[in-house]
């Protein structure tokens, strides 16, 4: 059926389109990715297997000036509170108010150090102009102080909406009294009715069970990912985001955490397991109560752009997400032995569809070796992956501590010498209009034309997951006559920009080169 559209009809369609576009709130990704006129770069300053020596905050403190020199503008710190044990990475969250201050779980310090050491590290970062993002774990609590008798039913782990037993009493680890902290910072004590379920019955001690609590208002939170029927339950004691006391306490904690450390933003854990509207409203509340337009990025771990878009819509686009689909594209490319179609490297990604809401990353603590979501990008492809995230215009990139400093416990080498030149390219040269040349199965590239705010800026990135080669790319007529070299050192020689602003840039096989006017 052919539709006729006159001027009025066209204007109506245009107005409707503009209303849709303007209904998406401004996101801070654009601000953070272009930090005070320079390119912003986040570093995730931890990996899963850091030593339990209590010195990580001290390491961060002493590293602040070095991070600044590399162009790092924000640091995502690990969960800073007391976990279920001293060696807990922080995701077995026990007491969100204990930042290494009280004798609980057999220790005063956390895996990373004491509260005073943490605050000194934050001060050092701030003095170097680096923002601090706190990790936020609100989905569950671990390391309870005591058990309680709770009425519950078992559910099918593969379909949590299906009850597989009748109701009976279990012994659940759900009582949190915080005896070492008492009422300092907060007098709130957690009880069974603040949770939705657990995966352990202390009285029966059976593995591979998930128990959904019974009682007034008890049900899985409904506004979550639909994997396994309802993916509210993940681990430990699952927090009930429908309970008004819980909502109020977590909001109060968010304000306290922000003000105590002077945080500039958050990384929010496991949001696909948390009621979507809770996360949306929590962010809005903390921003309003602190008077700070806090940056926020959520971890929605699913290689499914549609599911991520649904989450962003349900949360009113008020924060960004990690680009998990891009991570898997990078991982798959690294495993394909040169047979990945590099023209499609951005297909199905957040940064392609919603660049203003995309935090791009290569790997993190969940994808590293021996973790539940292991999907570690192979070493040979890491420089290509970091060039893909660090030298392009779109997205707000994050650098993983385990890539930069290595993972000694698993024999993963530090790639600092490979990543530093790419960070330098981002800091000094990756500015201005972008021209894409994603037109070959193996060899792809793009250029940045530079801008007047950054003298000598502009670059040409070219990479191949197969054989080496070259590509003519446009860098700007104002670059005519300039002699460019490869900042990575992978290629020797130079490229002279012709009178029309084009250069013939080359790359080795299975490698990346970033050409700049040094």
From Swiss-Prot:
Keyword Protease set for record: no
UniProt keyword annotations, A-Z: Carbohydrate metabolism, Glycosidase, Hydrolase, Metal-binding, Secreted, Signal
Residues binding Ca(2+) 1, per UniProt: 139, 232, 238, 273
GO cellular component, one term: extracellular region
Active-site positions on this chain: 269, 299
Annotated binding of Ca(2+) 2, by residue: 196, 219, 221, 240, 242
Localization, UniProt: Secreted
Reactions catalysed: Hydrolysis of (1->4)-alpha-D-glucosidic linkages in amylaceous polysaccharides, to remove successive maltohexaose residues from the non-reducing chain ends
Pfam annotation, one family: Alpha-amy_C_pro
Cofactor binding summary note: Binds 2 calcium ions per subunit. Binds 1 sodium ion per subunit.
Alphabetical GO biological process terms: starch catabolic process
Enzyme class, UniProt record, top EC level: hydrolase
Primary residence: secreted
Cofactor(s) this protein requires: Ca(2+); Na(+)
GO molecular function, one term: alpha-amylase activity
Gene3D superfamilies: 2.40.30.140, Glycosidases, Golgi alpha-mannosidase II
Residues bound to Na(+): 196, 221, 232, 238
Enzyme Commission number, as recorded: 3.2.1.98
Site (Transition state stabilizer): 366
Pathway: Glycan degradation; starch degradation
InterPro entries on file: A-amylase_thermo (IPR013776), Alpha-amylase_C_pro (IPR015237), Alpha_amylase (IPR006046), Glyco_hydro_13_cat_dom (IPR006047), Glyco_hydro_b (IPR013780), Glycoside_hydrolase_SF (IPR017853)
Presence of the UniProt keyword Cytoplasm in the record: no
Signal peptide (UniProt feature, chain positions): 1-33
Protein family: Belongs to the glycosyl hydrolase 13 family.
Record protein name field: Glucan 1,4-alpha-maltohexaosidase
Record lineage: Bacteria, Bacillati, Bacillota, Bacilli, Bacillales
């Amino acid at each position: 059926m052919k539709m006729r559209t006159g001027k009025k009809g066209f204007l109506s369609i245009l107005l409707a389109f503009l209303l849709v576009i303007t209904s998406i709130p401004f996101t801070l990704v654009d601000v953070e990715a272009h930090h005070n006129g320079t390119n912003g770069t986040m570093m995730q300053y931890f990996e899963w297997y850091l030593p339990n020596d209590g010195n990580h905050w001290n390491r961060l403190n002493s590293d602040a000036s070095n991070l600044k020199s590399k162009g790092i503008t924000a640091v995502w710190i690990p969960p800073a509170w007391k976990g279920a044990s001293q060696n807990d990475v922080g995701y077995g969250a026990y007491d969100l108010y204990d930042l290494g201050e009280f004798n609980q779980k057999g220790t005063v310090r956390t895996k990373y150090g004491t509260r005073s050491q943490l605050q000194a590290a934050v001060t050092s970062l701030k003095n170097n102009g680096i923002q601090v993002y706190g990790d936020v774990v609100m989905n569950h609590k671990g390391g309870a102080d005591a058990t309680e008798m709770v009425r519950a039913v078992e559910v099918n782990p593969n379909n949590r909406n299906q009850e597989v037993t009748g109701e009976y009493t279990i012994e659940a680890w759900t009582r949190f009294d915080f005896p070492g902290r008492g009422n300092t910072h907060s007098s709130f004590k957690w009880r069974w009715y603040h949770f939705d379920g657990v995966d352990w019955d202390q009285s029966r001690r059976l593995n591979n069970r998930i128990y959904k609590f019974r009682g007034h208002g008890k049900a899985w939170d409904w506004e979550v990912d639909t994997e396994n029927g309802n993916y509210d339950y993940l681990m430990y004691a699952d927090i009930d985001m429908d309970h008004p006391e819980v909502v109020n306490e977590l909001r109060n904690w968010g304000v306290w955490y922000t003000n105590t450390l002077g945080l500039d933003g958050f990384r929010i854990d496991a949001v696909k397991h948390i009621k979507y509207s809770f996360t949306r409203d929590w962010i809005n509340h903390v921003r309003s109560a602190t008077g700070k337009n806090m940056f926020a990025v959520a971890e929605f771990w699913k290689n499914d752009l549609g599911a991520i878009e649904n989450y962003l819509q349900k949360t009113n686009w008020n924060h960004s997400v990690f680009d998990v689909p891009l991570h898997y594209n990078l991982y798959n490319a690294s495993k394909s032995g040169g047979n990945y179609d590099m023209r499609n490297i951005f297909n199905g990604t957040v940064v392609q569809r919603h660049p203003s809401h995309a935090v791009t990353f290569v790997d993190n603590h969940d994808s590293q070796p021996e973790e539940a979501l292991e999907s570690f990008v192979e070493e040979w492809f890491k420089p290509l992956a970091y060039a893909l995230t660090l030298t392009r215009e779109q997205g707000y990139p994050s650098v993983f501590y385990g890539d930069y400093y290595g993972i000694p416990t698993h024999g993963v080498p530090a790639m600092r010498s490979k990543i530093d030149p790419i960070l330098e390219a981002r800091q000094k040269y990756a500015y201005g209009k972008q021209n894409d040349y994603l037109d070959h199965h193996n060899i792809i590239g793009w250029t940045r034309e530079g801008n007047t705010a950054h003298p000598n800026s502009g670059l040409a990135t070219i990479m191949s997951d197969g054989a080496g080669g070259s590509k003519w790319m446009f860098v700007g007529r104002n670059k005519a006559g300039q002699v460019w070299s490869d900042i990575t050192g992978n290629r020797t020689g130079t490229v002279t920009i012709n009178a029309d602003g084009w250069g013939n840039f080359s790359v080795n096989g299975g490698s990346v080169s970033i050409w700049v006017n040094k």
